[in-house]
């Protein structure tokens, strides 16, 4: 159980997520906006929400208004419960490559997933379109709209091709 310093909360969370032997349960207080990012659903997903939700079951316990503290900070907080998944497809071996795919997909939030992958990975757009379509993903969608299962499918079916050196 922790009240993380807000300026370092994302760093600490990513560090916990990278551990091979994670705590059985994490109850953390975040700045409310960070908690919303961690708990986001398709349509507003971010890199942090995808990787957190791939590795942990997550739920908001409650919001904590700024007036609950003395002196009152400028922001509201939220308490989030994270329980590491035992059955996540992400392992210590594929954690970094999966994050590479997410970074490429979320590299330009206003662009389509196809454009992001093509630009970030220096691959022809037609190749990225083909890989996305083979996974049942419309290349015109944005990364924030993809479901967790779609990210997993894209990684499983396309990672070697996307990141191969030519």
Where do the PLM segments sit?
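Class I S-adenosyl-L-methionine
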Residues: 1, 8-143, 153-166
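Ca2+-coordinating acidic residues in Ca2+-binding motifs
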Residues: 150
């Amino acid at each position: 159980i922790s009240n993380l310093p807000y300026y370092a909360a994302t760093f600490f969370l990513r560090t916990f997520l990278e551990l091979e032997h994670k705590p059985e349960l994490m109850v953390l207080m975040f700045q409310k906006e960070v908690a919303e990012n961690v708990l986001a659903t398709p349509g507003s997903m971010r890199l942090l929400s995808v990787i957190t939700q791939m590795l942990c079951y997550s739920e908001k316990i409650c919001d904590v208004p700024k007036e609950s503290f003395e002196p009152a900070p400028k922001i509201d907080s939220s308490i989030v419960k994270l329980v590491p998944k035992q059955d996540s497809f992400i392992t210590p071996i594929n954690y970094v490559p999966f994050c590479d795919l997410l970074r490429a997909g979320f590299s330009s939030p206003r662009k389509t997933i196809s454009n992001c992958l093509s630009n970030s990975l220096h691959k022809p757009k037609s190749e990225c379109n083909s890989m996305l379509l083979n996974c049942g993903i419309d290349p015109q969608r944005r990364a924030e709209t993809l479901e967790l299962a779609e990210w997993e499918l894209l990684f499983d079916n396309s990672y070697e091709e996307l990141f191969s050196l030519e």
